[in-house]
UniProtKB/Swiss-Prot annotation:
Protein name from the UniProt record: Elongation factor G, mitochondrial
Residues at which GTP binds: 109-116, 185-189, 239-242
GO biological process: mitochondrial translational elongation
Species in which this protein is naturally found: Aspergillus terreus (strain NIH 2624 / FGSC A1156)
Transit peptide: 1-24
Function: Mitochondrial GTPase that catalyzes the GTP-dependent ribosomal translocation step during translation elongation. During this step, the ribosome changes from the pre-translocational (PRE) to the post-translocational (POST) state as the newly formed A-site-bound peptidyl-tRNA and P-site-bound deacylated tRNA move to the P and E sites, respectively. Catalyzes the coordinated movement of the two tRNA molecules, the mRNA and conformational changes in the ribosome.
NCBIfam families the UniProt entry points to: EF-G, PRK12740.1-5, small_GTP
């Protein structure tokens, strides 16, 4: 490891180094500081009494700047050795105080678990809005975070919405502390999963909401996978405690068993269903009730109702036992049979939550205005501030080596554009600042194309409203106008060559042909398509040259329907759509060898290329592989690049039914060139021809997308639901029968699920619901393969007749 040189520090900062002791052990409870920055802290020499206050301030600024620079160097040269604790310890005290009061959180859950309702209460209790409005917009207003008319009509969240609020939390002495919360409310429907992906990519923590009746559902498991992908700590909130059949402890068991993350209640409910009154805080052993017209006031008492005393004691013991499994300090106390104090429990929950080892579980009812404020206290107590989260970037100047980002305002800027929106003032770009300061009027550089951009306006977003600010520091989220970029772009101030890995973007599974009904709307149609693609990476637009149709692709029928409806409302463009098209794939069958010669010589410059090798299935179905094993230079390197390009072009449109190719390997081990007639174009074309011929000789197959499907319906319709799935050749994997509802888990082909929603509603008297998520590709049935091949061959023949 290259240690930061003390020679880089100002001379005055070094003057007292010999006298000042070097602290190797951090006072912070987290862990030992790294050696590279321990010496930096010790260099703060005591200024002579004669120095002026102004001179002391200047010296402190110089020292802070040198310390930040040394930490930045350690973050780049030895990121593994620079601990997050060392970064925190060397923070400027003012910055440390600011960051300790910031929380960047998201709210995520299954459909209809109450995310937006809960967010509405958070905004009301923090004073961000003056009145509570409900989700479906029945009062002609609708929830604040559902700003689109479509969201209010359908009662679902389509786009993630960002806001900020201040929460005042009281400590044990009753002293008030103000915390700043950047909050993103996300959709629950699987079709809008990219909105959850990009929110979690930039957040430091999350609140996972579960229904007290349904517990862990299909989209809960998807959200859990997304949180794990981005290492996002979470607290859990069991909502709808006032619903019939509410059972929070069953939900906690499901978090432990289905999500496989240790979880324990930090509250127990006082009553349930219609008798739900409040909660008991298991750390302080106090009963908490909401009072006031909208539950805006809390009443705490030491008198725990007799009916819940035994449950509270039992669940407190379970909390301590669970913590003992994930935290060393509590484990020692547990083994010595010592009762941990409230503060020890609080610290242990925070350590384990930030360490992704545990999730504390809160409970309440957002709709009934009960127990939302204690959950907000949990956000402050147990979720990390920006300085406690490790964020990495890639240094393009050092072969994309990993570097640690340091949340100091004084360091060079690094920020990530994670979401784009079109507004009345132009493109709105949401940015998370990880390092440095983003200032109005500053020039920043897009790391993707090194393009310089000026920042004309910076705003904080409150759903569809905005508040202008002059600058944003490290650890904050904002939006900027007038920046032309793509979702996932990294911005720097030009001093660093850093880029951040972008979010995971799933492949579309369904397509539709689309065109405007009126040709006069073609310009507006093109403008809408371009905008929607910029905003949503899972929405794709392609033009099929053979059929001369524009195709839109997305994550499901609802996803595409929403964009068609938005085009009508926002651009006044009515569209005609064709039937849904499944994103089939083609794959090779057997190992097959090829020896293909392309030879066209007609007096002038001709074409000559010979490629020899074999094709076979890959080990992983999800990838295509091109390899070369040329010995003796029979094909030069520049022609081999052309061969590889030809291979990838051939994979874009397979010869069987015209869809993309998967799971195919091509290896070229010999060939021949001509002194004058060989060219890159010749070898590219020869490779494509060899590919098509060998592929068709290999007994290829058509693959169809299989969807992980979860159907929920009242228990009396279990037989009807299973019969409906069997009719569509679904593979039923599991079922959960609850008190009043049944959940069936199955794998179904996407092709067989078109129109399923209307059949499900008819079979369950409108009470059934289902979600689908892409699972994997599987060989289509022989009958379907024959139909698809015949249809493609007929279309090709008809096209050649024209």
């Amino acid at each position: 490891m290259r240690y930061p040189s003390l020679a880089r520090l100002p001379r005055r900062a070094l003057s007292g180094l010999a006298r000042a002791p070097v602290r190797l052990q951090s006072q912070n409870f987290l862990s030992q500081r790294c050696a590279s920055t321990a010496a930096l802290r010790s260099a703060s020499a005591v200024a002579p009494a004669c120095q002026s206050a102004l001179h002391r301030q200047f010296q402190q600024r110089r020292y802070a700047s040198a310390t930040a620079s040394a930490v930045l160097e350690a973050a780049a040269s030895s990121p593994d050795n620079l601990t997050q604790e060392a970064i925190i310890d060397n923070l400027d005290p003012v910055e440390a105080e600011r960051l300790s009061r910031v929380r960047n959180i998201g709210i995520a859950a299954h459909i209809d678990s109450g995310k937006t309702t809960c967010t509405e209460r958070v905004l009301f209790y923090t004073g961000r809005i003056k009145a509570i409005h409900e989700v479906r917009g029945g009062d002609k207003v609708g929830a604040k975070m559902d700003s689109m008319d479509l969201e209010r009509e359908k009662g679902i969240t389509i786009q993630s919405a960002a806001t900020f609020c201040d929460w005042v939390k009281k400590d044990k002495e009753g002293k008030e502390h103000k915390y700043h919360i950047n909050l993103i409310d996300t959709p629950g429907h699987i079709d809008f999963t990219i909105e959850v992906e990009r929110a979690l990519r930039v957040l430091d923590g999350a609140v996972m909401i579960l229904c007290a009746v349904s517990g862990v559902q299909s989209q809960t498991m998807t959200v859990d996978r997304q949180m794990r992908r981005y290492n996002v700590p979470r607290i859990s909130f069991i909502n709808k405690m006032d619903r019939m059949g509410a059972n929070p402890f069953k939900a906690i068991d499901q978090i432990n068993t289905k999500l496989k993350i240790p979880a324990a209640a930090v509250q127990v409910p006082i009553g349930a269903e219609d008798e739900f009154e409040g909660v008991v805080d298991l750390l302080r052993m106090k009963a908490i009730y909401n009072v006031g017209p909208s539950g805006e006031e809390l009443r705490e008492t030491d008198e725990i109702p007799e009916k819940v005393k035994a449950v509270a004691e039992e669940r407190r013991n379970m909390l301590i036992e669970t913590l003992a499994d994930v935290d060393d300090e509590i484990a020692e106390l547990f083994l010595s049979e010592t009762e941990p104090t409230e503060q020890q429990l609080r610290d242990a929950i925070r350590r384990a939550t930030i360490g992704l080892k545990f999730t504390p579980v809160f409970m309440g009812s957002a709709l009934a205005n009960k127990s939302v404020q204690p959950m907000l206290d949990g956000v402050i107590d147990y979720l990390p501030n920006p300085s406690e989260v490790q964020n990495l970037a890639l240094d393009k100047k050092r072969d994309e080596a990993s570097v640690k980002l340091v949340p100091y305002n004084s360091l060079p800027l690094v920020g990530l554009a994670f979401k784009l929106e079109e507004s009345n003032f132009g493109q709105l770009t949401y940015i998370r600042v990880y390092q440095g300061t983003l200032r109005k009027g500053a020039n920043v550089f897009n790391a993707r194309n090194d393009k310089k951009v000026k920042i004309p306006r910076i705003v904080r977003m409150h759903s569809n409203e905005m508040e202008e600010v002059s600058e944003i520091g490290a650890g904050e989220i904002c939006a900027v106008f007038g920046v032309d970029c793509a979702s996932g772009d990294t911005f720097t101030d030009g001093q660093l060559g850093y880029t951040m890995s972008s979010m995971f973007v799933p492949e579309p599974v369904i397509s539709l042909s689309i065109k405007p009904k009126n040709n006069k709307d073609a310009a507006k149609f093109s403008k809408a398509m371009a905008r929607f693609q910029r905003e949503d990476p899972t929405f794709r637009v392609t033009f099929d040259a053979e059929s001369e149709q524009t195709l839109i692709s997305g994550m499901g029928e609802l996803h595409l329907d929403i964009y068609i409806e938005r085009m009508r409302r926002e651009y006044n463009v009515d569209c005609e759509t064709g039937p849904p098209q499944v994103a089939y794939r083609e794959t090779i069958g057997n190992h097959v060898e090829f020896d293909h010669l392309l030879k066209k010589q007609s007096g002038g410059p001709g074409d000559y290329a010979r490629v020899v090798g074999y094709m076979e299935p890959t080990e992983k179905l999800e990838e295509n592989v091109f390899e070369e094993q040329i010995v003796g230079g029979s094909i030069s390197e520049k022609f081999l690049f052309a061969c590889e390009k030809g291979f990838h072009l051939a994979c874009e449109k397979g010869p069987l039914i015209g869809h993309k190719v998967l799971g195919t390997k091509m290896l070229i081990n010999d060939g021949a060139t001509h002194m004058t007639d060989s060219s890159e174009m010749s070898f590219k074309n020869a490779t494509q021809q060899a590919f098509r011929k060998a592929f068709m000789e290999s007994n290829p197959s058509v693959l169809e997308p299989m969807m992980k499907t979860v159907v929920t319906a009242p228990a009396e319709f279990q037989g009807d639901v299973i019969a409906l799935l069997n009719k569509r050749n679904a593979t039923i994997n599991d079922s959960d029968v609850g008190v009043d509802e049944v959940t069936v888990y199955a794998d179904c082909s996407l092709n067989g699920m078109f129109g399923f929603s209307s059949h499900l509603r008819a079979a369950t008297q409108g009470k059934g619901e289902y979600t689908m998520e892409f699972s994997h590709y599987e060989k289509a049935t022989p009958q379907l393969q024959k139909e698809l091949i015949a249809k493609y061959q007929k279309a090709q023949a008809d096209r050649h007749k024209k």
